[in-house]
C-alpha cells in the first residue's frame, strides 16, 4: 500500500521549485502536461499514487497545494503549459495580492489570518489519502511568504498532524553577497527556529552552492533561476525515487529518514548529485561506475552546501550519516566492492559514537527518461559542518540587531507589539544551541552531551539529545 505524501509549495521560491519538481515527476512516470498517462507509459512497477491521485476520468492530479500571498508566480503556472495538471481548488492566493513585503512577521501574521482556509485544503487532501505518511514543504527561508507563512504552517501541521512526518526542502540565501532583502538575517533566524523545532527533516538547498555548481560543474556563465531550480528538482526527484520505484528497503519516508537522523534536532541534511549535465553536454558521454559515482559524491565540489561551511575547521568536521541513492542497472557486488575501497582509502570521516558506514539504496531509473549515463547517484548526508551555515546566519543577525536596524518593520505585527523582541532572542538561543549540538557531535562523548544541564533538555516542541523521535521509530 502506498504511503501518500502531500506537497505544500509556499511563496515565490517554493512554487518555482515545486513546479520544476512536478515537471520532472511527470516525465519520469510518463504523465502528460494535462495529467494523462502517455500511450508509451506501459511498463508499470512504479508508485504514482505516492505523489499523485486519479480523478474520475483517470487523469493524474498532484497531491499538492500551491500557496502564495502575491499572484505573479501562481498566475504564471495557471497560464502555463501545466495549467491543467493541478487541482485548482488547492491553489491559494491572498485576496489583496500584496505579498508579505519580504517580512517574516507579515507572512506569519497573514498565515494566521487564513489558517482555516488553508487547513481545509490540507484536511481535504489528507482525507483523500488511504495511508498518509507526511508532508513535504518547499520554501525559501529568506523572504516573507515562504519564511513567515511557511513557519506558521510548520507549527500548525505539527499541532494538527503530530504523528505525520514533515520534511522540508528549504532554500537558504546566498550569504556571500549583499542581498536585496535587507532583513534577510531576521527572516532566516525566525524560520530556522521553526525548522529546528517543527520539522522532522530539512534538506538544505544553499543558493551559494547551487550558483557555484551551475558555473563550475555545468559551465554556465550566468546561471538563471530556472537553471538552478532545475538542479533543485533533480535533487528532489532523486531523493524520492525509492518511494516511487520501491525496492526492499527505503520504500517509505520513515525508512528513508530513520537511518539518516539518529538524534531529533540534528535533522538538517546536505545533498550531492553526480553526474550533472545540461542539454548541450548530453553528447559528451563518459563511463560511470558505482565506485566513480560514490567517490564523486564525497567531493566538496559536488555538495550543494557552501564551500566556506564545508572547508571551515574541515579537519574536525565529521559525517553523522550518509545515504547514497544509486540509480541505474547496478550489480550489488559492485556496491560492496566500492564501499570496501572507500573504507580502505579512508575517504570518509565518521562520528565515533555511531555506525561508521555509508548506506546505499539501489533504485531503478525511469524507463521514459533517456540519460547519457548508465549510473547516477544522490547523496543525502548529515554532516557537522552544516553548523557553519547556521553560525553565519547568527553573525549576520547579530550585526543587524546590534544596530537595531529595520526592527520597526516587525513591531507593526502582534508578535512583536509593544517592543517585545523576545521571539528574536528565543530564536537566537535555539539556533545557538543547535550549533553547539552539531559541534558536540564531533566528540566521542556526545551521547552524554546536555545531560548534566537540565536547561538544555528540550521539552514540549523538541526532544533531548539521544532520544529517538517517535515518528522515526520503527
Curated annotation (Swiss-Prot):
Pfam families in alphabetical order: Tubulin, Tubulin_C
Knockout-associated phenotype: Alteration of the morphology of feeding site and failure of nematode life cycle completion.
Location of the protein in the cell: Cytoplasm, Cytoskeleton, Microtubule organizing center; Cytoplasm; Nucleus; Cytoplasm, Cell cortex
Gene Ontology terms, MF aspect: GTP binding
BP GO terms, sorted: cellular localization; cytokinesis by cell plate formation; cytoplasmic microtubule organization; leaf development; microtubule nucleation; microtubule polymerization; response to nematode; root hair cell tip growth
Subunit structure: Gamma-tubulin complex is composed of gamma-tubulin and GCP proteins.
InterPro entries on file: Gamma_tubulin, Tub_FtsZ_C, Tubulin, Tubulin/FtsZ-like_C, Tubulin/FtsZ_2-layer-sand-dom, Tubulin/FtsZ_GTPase_sf, Tubulin_C, Tubulin_CS
SMART domains tied to this protein: Tubulin, Tubulin_C
Any GO CC annotation of this UniProt entry: cell cortex
Natural source organism: Arabidopsis thaliana
Residues bound to GTP: 142-148
Protein name: Tubulin gamma-1 chain
Family: Belongs to the tubulin family.
Function: Tubulin is the major constituent of microtubules. The gamma chain is found at microtubule organizing centers (MTOC) such as the spindle poles, suggesting that it is involved in the minus-end nucleation of microtubule assembly.
Induction description: Up-regulated in galls upon nematode infection.
Lineage: superkingdom: Eukaryota
PANTHER family: TUBULIN (PTHR11588)
Amino acid at each position: 500500500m502506498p504511503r501518500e505524501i502531500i506537497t505544500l509549495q509556499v511563496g515565490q521560491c517554493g512554487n518555482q521549485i515545486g513546479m520544476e519538481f512536478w515537471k520532472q515527476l511527470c516525465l519520469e512516470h510518463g504523465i502528460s502536461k494535462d495529467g494523462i498517462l502517455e500511450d508509451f507509459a506501459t511498463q508499470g512497477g512504479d508508485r504514482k499514487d505516492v505523489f499523485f491521485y486519479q480523478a474520475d476520468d483517470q487523469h493524474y492530479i498532484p497531491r499538492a497545494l500551491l500557496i502564495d500571498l502575491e499572484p505573479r508566480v501562481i498566475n504564471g503556472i495557471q497560464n502555463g503549459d501545466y495549467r491543467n495538471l493541478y487541482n485548482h481548488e488547492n491553489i491559494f492566493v491572498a485576496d489583496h495580492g500584496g505579498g508579505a513585503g519580504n517580512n517574516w512577521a507579515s507572512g506569519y501574521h497573514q498565515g494566521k489570518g487564513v489558517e482555516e482556509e488553508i487547513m481545509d485544503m490540507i484536511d481535504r487532501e489528507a482525507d483523500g489519502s488511504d495511508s498518509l505518511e507526511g508532508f513535504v514543504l518547499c520554501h525559501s527561508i529568506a523572504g516573507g511568504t515562504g519564511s513567515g507563512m511557511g513557519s506558521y504552517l510548520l507549527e500548525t501541521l505539527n499541532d494538527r498532524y503530530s504523528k505525520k512526518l514533515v520534511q522540508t526542502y528549504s532554500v537558504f540565501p546566498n550569504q556571500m553577497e549583499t542581498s536585496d532583502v535587507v532583513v534577510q538575517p531576521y527572516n532566516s533566524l525566525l524560520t530556522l527556529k521553526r525548522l529546528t523545532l517543527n520539522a522532522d527533516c530539512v534538506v538544505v538547498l544553499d543558493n551559494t552552492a547551487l550558483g557555484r555548481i551551475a558555473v563550475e560543474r555545468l559551465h554556465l556563465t550566468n546561471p538563471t533561476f530556472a537553471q538552478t531550480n532545475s538542479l533543485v528538482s533533480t535533487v528532489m526527484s532523486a531523493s524520492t525515487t525509492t518511494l516511487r520505484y520501491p525496492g526492499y528497503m527505503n520504500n517509505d519516508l520513515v525508512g528513508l529518514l530513520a537511518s539518516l537522523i539518529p538524534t531529533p534536532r540534528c535533522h538538517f541534511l546536505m545533498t550531492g548529485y553526480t553526474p550533472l549535465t545540461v542539454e548541450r553536454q548530453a553528447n559528451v558521454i563518459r563511463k560511470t561506475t558505482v565506485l566513480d559515482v560514490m567517490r564523486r559524491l564525497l567531493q566538496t565540489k559536488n555538495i550543494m552546501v557552501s564551500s566556506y561551511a564545508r572547508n571551515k575547521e574541515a579537519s574536525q568536521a565529521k559525517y553523522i550519516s550518509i545515504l547514497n541513492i544509486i540509480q541505474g542497472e547496478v550489480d550489488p557486488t559492485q556496491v560492496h566492492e566500492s564501499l570496501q575501497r572507500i573504507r580502505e582509502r579512508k575517504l570518509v570521516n565518521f562520528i565515533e559514537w555511531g555506525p561508521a558506514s555509508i548506506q546505499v539504496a539501489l533504485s531503478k531509473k525511469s524507463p521514459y527518461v533517456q540519460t547519457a549515463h548508465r549510473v547516477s547517484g544522490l547523496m543525502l548526508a548529515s554532516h557537522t559542518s552544516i553548523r557553519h551555515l547556521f553560525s553565519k546566519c547568527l553573525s549576520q543577525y547579530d550585526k543587524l540587531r546590534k544596530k537595531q536596524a529595520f526592527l520597526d518593520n516587525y513591531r507593526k505585527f502582534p508578535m512583536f507589539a509593544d517592543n517585545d523582541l523576545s521571539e528574536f532572542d528565543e530564536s537566537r538561543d535555539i539556533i545557538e544551541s543547535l550549533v553547539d549540538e552539531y559541534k558536540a557531535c564531533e566528540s566521542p562523548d556526545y551521547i552524554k552531551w546536555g545531560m548534566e544541564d537540565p536547561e538544555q533538555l528540550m521539552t514540549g516542541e523538541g526532544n533531548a539529545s539521544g532520544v529517538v523521535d517517535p515518528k522515526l521509530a520503527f
